[in-house]
């Protein structure tokens, strides 16, 4: 298992060793799409070989010998903080500070013995770093899921396919269109004609070309 500090590092690890399989978040039911990851994926030369949907549940954790009255600051990833806005609104005296990662926030508090600090992370991360769970399930929306993509070097796709338990029933594409009237509608009409279900469409601006876009679709 290779832990990466950024999504860029995930693709770098796959590029460095073609036997390495990468996993990265692409979409959350509350926060929406991670747009930057779409572009990283397009530039990487890797291929999507699967996906995994994970139920997200956040916990409020602190050092083992501290309690609610000791907490003055909470650290976590910006998206996790956003997903717990209702809970944080009930504790206005606690200062909210953004961090790089949910689990990393808990790890830093534990290793550096940051008294008065709490982290928002998973219960598994709390157990791993010996943190005390003050409250579980603090996310605002209990139907909180993140979709992860599994990516690999194109040379590994056939080998991985042999170990798949079911048929491939999903594909992702990226394309650009001429900046003319009805160009996107024509593409969607083709998908409709062949009874292909479009599950997602996302537009991103093309850097250096004003008001022109590329489209990412899942079918």
Walk through the language-model features, giving the residues of each:
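Domain-level signature for soluble enzymes in the chorismate/prephenate branch of the shikimate pathway
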Residues: 1-219
